[in-house]
Amino acid sequence: MYVVSTKQMLNNAQRGGYAVPAFNIHNLETMQVVVETAANLHAPVIIAGTPGTFTHAGTENLLALVSAMAKQYHHPLAIHLDHHTKFDDIAQKVRSGVRSVMIDASHLPFAQNISRVKEVVDFCHRFDVSVEAELGQLGGQEDDVQVNEADALYTNPAQAREFAEATGIDSLAVAIGTAHGMYASAPALDFSRLENIRQWVNLPLVLHGASGLSTKDIQQTIKLGICKINVATELKNAFSQALKNYLTEHPEATDPRDYLQSAKSAMRDVVSKVIADCGCEGRA
């Protein structure tokens, strides 16, 4: 079986001291690049999609594509709901076959966050679906979820344990200074906070907002317990910039099968680098 849960992937990463990259998919070409590159490098990867991505592609279509490509490349893949907020939406996609979910209720007060997440966990675990949740809030925008930088909140280590125990989640997304989108300047990550969270919580930890982070910072977070690295903006930017450059230089181009090759090449470089930074090559 090639379409798998993220739970075993992340538990393996936690034991092995590496991270599994979760790449947000926006079109067929992104999927092709991620899966082909991961298969060539024998690296575990997670195919992630926001609510907007699932609406754009269609849940059944996306599930069928992931399954077909996993079989084609004989490579295990996980498909993951990223930053989903509505119980009914999550339930519908789980019933369709999704086996990994991020319920994002981080905008709610602590007690309400726990209540919302536990409702999703109780439902998802009936279907053997792994659940990620976030404590603290990242600045920036991901799909329809937008948080002003001034309102971003860091994860409280002591609350993290209470949150994990009360909800029964399988992995915890932490806020330590990253943000969604690309960075105008290098962020100051709170490694001490991450180390404290690791001491309080024994779950696989997740880092959102990794686009544009240095190799050094990514690898330091992995040493301190991060087992899943999310990448979205870096792929979109590589695709868009390469495509713009190609069409500017070749205004006569009309065949997408030709002019999308430059965009795929640019994304391939990003995927290869992220896999190397995560230390997961050869781990699939």
Curated annotation (Swiss-Prot):
Pfam families attached to this UniProt entry: F_bP_aldolase
UniProt: Zn(2+) binding residues: H83, H180, H208
Pathway in which the depicted protein is active: Carbohydrate metabolism; D-tagatose 6-phosphate degradation; D-glyceraldehyde 3-phosphate and glycerone phosphate from D-tagatose 6-phosphate: step 2/2
Binding site for dihydroxyacetone phosphate: G181, G209, A210, S211, N230, V231, A232, T233
Swiss-Prot/TrEMBL GO biological process terms: D-tagatose 6-phosphate catabolic process; galactitol catabolic process
GO function term, MF aspect, one: tagatose-bisphosphate aldolase activity
GO CC aspect terms: catalytic complex; cytosol
Catalytic activity, reaction form: D-tagatofuranose 1,6-bisphosphate = D-glyceraldehyde 3-phosphate + dihydroxyacetone phosphate
Induction of its expression: Constitutively expressed. Up-regulated under low pH conditions.
Bound cofactor: record note: Binds 1 zinc ion per subunit.
EC number(s) reported in the record: 4.1.2.40
Keywords (A to Z) from UniProt: Galactitol metabolism, Lyase, Metal-binding, Zinc
Active site (record annotation): D82 (proton donor)
PROSITE patterns: ALDOLASE_CLASS_II_1, ALDOLASE_CLASS_II_2
Cofactor dependence: Zn(2+)
InterPro entries: Aldolase_TIM, Class_II_FBP_aldolase, FBA_II, TagBP_ald_KbaY/GatY, TagBP_aldolase_GatY
Family: Belongs to the class II fructose-bisphosphate aldolase family. TagBP aldolase GatY subfamily.
Function of the protein: Catalytic subunit of the tagatose-1,6-bisphosphate aldolase GatYZ, which catalyzes the reversible aldol condensation of dihydroxyacetone phosphate (DHAP or glycerone-phosphate) with glyceraldehyde 3-phosphate (G3P) to produce tagatose 1,6-bisphosphate (TBP). Requires GatZ subunit for full activity and stability. Is involved in the catabolism of galactitol. Has a high aldolase activity for TBP and a very low one for fructose 1,6-bisphosphate (FBP).
HAMAP family (alphabetical): TagBP_aldolase_GatY (MF_01294)
Subunit structure: Forms a complex with GatZ.
Protein name, entry field: D-tagatose-1,6-bisphosphate aldolase subunit GatY
Protein's organism: Escherichia coli (strain K12)
